Amino acid sequence: MIQMQSYLDVADNSGAKEVMCIKVLGGSKRRYARIGDIIKVTVKDAIPRGKVKKGEVYDAVVVRTRKGVRRADGSLIRFDGNAAVLLNNKQEPIGTRIFGPVTRELRSEKFMKIVSLAPEVL
């Protein structure tokens, strides 16, 4: 579960290393984001010649959480850390590569690009 002030790793090659959630999108009283939810983030740590700079604000989709996701068959998929993929204004990934596994829950029409770029889909 991601909330405001949560730090997340970045799972793409956009140039950001770490981001902080500043808003969970989708309703005025919405507190938590799960896998597949869109959040507003600010870049806290970035590499020198990346596509994004420290302090910039972007949308991001949550791809991994320590809380995990419960499947219909009762299984639970958990990860060691929280991670997100940065999105541009058209809700497309900024990076051209995705690092680490992503879950099948991202297989909606909006995020098929992320699923196809990911090295492993759980």
UniProtKB/Swiss-Prot annotation:
GO cellular component: cytosolic large ribosomal subunit
Pfam families given in the database record: Ribosomal_L14
Gene3D superfamilies found in the cross-reference section: Ribosomal protein L14
Keywords associated with the record: Ribonucleoprotein, Ribosomal protein, RNA-binding, rRNA-binding
Single Gene Ontology BP annotation: translation
UniProt xrefs under InterPro entries: Ribosomal_uL14 (IPR000218), Ribosomal_uL14_bac-type (IPR005745), Ribosomal_uL14_CS (IPR019972), Ribosomal_uL14_sf (IPR036853)
PROSITE patterns in alphabetical order: RIBOSOMAL_L14
One MF annotation (Gene Ontology) recorded for this entry: large ribosomal subunit rRNA binding
NCBIfam families in alphabetical order: rplN_bact
Function text: Binds to 23S rRNA. Forms part of two intersubunit bridges in the 70S ribosome.
Subunit details: Part of the 50S ribosomal subunit. Forms a cluster with proteins L3 and L19. In the 70S ribosome, L14 and L19 interact and together make contacts with the 16S rRNA in bridges B5 and B8.
Family, as annotated: Belongs to the universal ribosomal protein uL14 family.
Protein name: Large ribosomal subunit protein uL14
Origin organism lineage: Bacteria, Pseudomonadati, Pseudomonadota, Gammaproteobacteria, Lysobacterales
